[in-house]
A protein has these predicted regions:
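N-terminal pre-domain/capping segments
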Residues: 2-151, 165, 175, 182, ...
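Acidic/histidine-rich catalytic cores of soluble enzymes
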Residues: 37, 71-72, 171-221
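Active-site groove signature of glycoside hydrolases
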Residues: 143-163, 184, 189-193
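Active-site cleft segment of glycoside hydrolase catalytic domains centered on the general acid/base Glu
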Residues: 160-174
């Protein structure tokens, strides 16, 4: 698939899976206090992000005033490279505090939006690639810590046909990430949304293999 076609496919997919219409549904409901706690994931508003109608800095106010929700979930791509600006991150901290928003998690996707190519994978059989991916994810662990998130979600994409090798590579990479993250109180979670992670038995083996309080799963229904 050509790059332009892949980009269009991604954007169209995001449009179909997003929920900019949530306002009427949520505002029309009443939830019994202490019975149900909700958070909003900025990925749900991806079309607005790509149309420059929404910025990460707008998110705390948006979910508080439009939906009455007190917890935010983020997506690495939504930062659009602005996470490299320390003043941007500081401003996100300030706005989150001003609107009494708890920041929970960053979904970390290593995708070049210009080429639509995947970046280095934590589950690769090539050590050089795994090391590159480790550096990328450690950076996002630091960002997550700065804005008060308790977790980042990682992907375990691999072309390796041997599931046991993918398990070993993934276990090694995540264990190294935990060495970096645990001092900051940030956990690493794996979502069942593609490839080997869709195998529940394999995912259980991964959790047991790593055996850490700083690793977990994120069910994708």
């Amino acid at each position: 698939m050509k790059t332009s076609s892949r980009r269009k496919f991604l954007f169209n997919s995001l449009a179909l899976t997003s929920f900019p219409f949530l306002s009427s549904g949520i505002n029309g409901c009443t939830f019994e206090k202490n019975k149900l706690e909700l958070a909003l994931q900025i990925y749900s508003f991806a079309p607005l992000l790509f149309q420059n109608k929404l910025d990460v800095l707008m998110f705390p106010q948006m979910i508080k005033e439009n939906y009455g929700i007190n917890a935010a979930e983020y997506w690495s791509i939504a930062f659009m490279g602005k996470e490299k600006d320390k003043s941007f991150i500081k401003e996100l901290q300030i706005r989150s505090k001003d609107y009494d928003i708890d920041n929970l998690i960053i979904l970390v996707d290593n995708i070049d939006l210009k080429t639509m190519e995947n970046g280095p994978s934590l589950a690769s059989s090539e050590k050089v690639e795994r090391d590159q991916s480790l550096s990328f994810h450690k950076y996002w662990i630091d960002i997550a810590s700065e804005i008060g998130c308790h977790s980042i979600r990682v992907n375990l994409r691999s072309d390796e046909s041997d599931d046991n090798k993918v398990l070993d590579n993934s276990s090694e990479s995540i264990s190294k990430l935990i060495e970096h993250s645990k001092g900051q109180g940030v956990s690493i979670v794996v979502e069942n949304h593609g490839g080997i992670t869709g195998d529940a038995d394999w995912l259980v083996r991964l959790m047991k293999n790593i055996n850490s309080d700083f690793v977990g799963t994120l069910p994708d229904f």
